[in-house]
């Protein structure tokens, strides 16, 4: 994998690590982030090879874009996910994680990555905690890695 720079950018008072080069974003998503999504599928007893989103990853072109938070849509299947066996409740865990991240951003200026959005419908596919936190902080725009077919 080629090395790409990850400069720091500030937007609306929030600091981001960003990859600006589309090839770098592609590599990052198709290696590092893909691993996370495959692990998520496995933990939910789904076959990652059957996941429609994962099947399109390598076909997507990626870009770094600034997007109004209000334009980003949430996937109800993700937001409402509950695993009755383990007791895991996505919304409850998200609320806890978002509070921690909000504190980190407000008090310590921690650096975050852009959220990942599917361009054809502006569906958020990764970064629910970052999105929720930014929305709670009243941040109107965010950096996104935008994927399009």
Range-by-range predicted roles:
Residues 1-71, 81-92:
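An acidic, glycine-rich, mixed-charge low-complexity segment common to nucleic-acid enzymes
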């Amino acid at each position: 994998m080629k090395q790409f720079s990850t400069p720091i950018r500030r937007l609306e008072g929030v600091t981001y690590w960003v990859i600006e080069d589309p090839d770098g974003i592609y590599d990052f998503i198709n290696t590092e982030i893909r691993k996370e999504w495959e692990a998520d599928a496995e933990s939910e007893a789904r076959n990652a090879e059957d996941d429609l989103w994962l099947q399109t990853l390598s076909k997507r072109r990626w870009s770094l874009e600034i997007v109004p938070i209000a334009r980003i849509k949430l996937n109800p299947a993700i937001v409402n996910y509950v695993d009755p066996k383990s007791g895991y409740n996505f919304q409850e865990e998200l609320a806890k994680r978002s509070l921690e991240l909000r504190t980190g951003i407000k008090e310590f200026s921690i650096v975050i990555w852009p959220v990942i959005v599917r361009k054809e419908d502006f569906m958020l596919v990764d970064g629910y905690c970052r999105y929720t936190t930014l929305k709670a902080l009243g941040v109107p725009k965010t950096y996104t890695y935008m994927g399009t077919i």
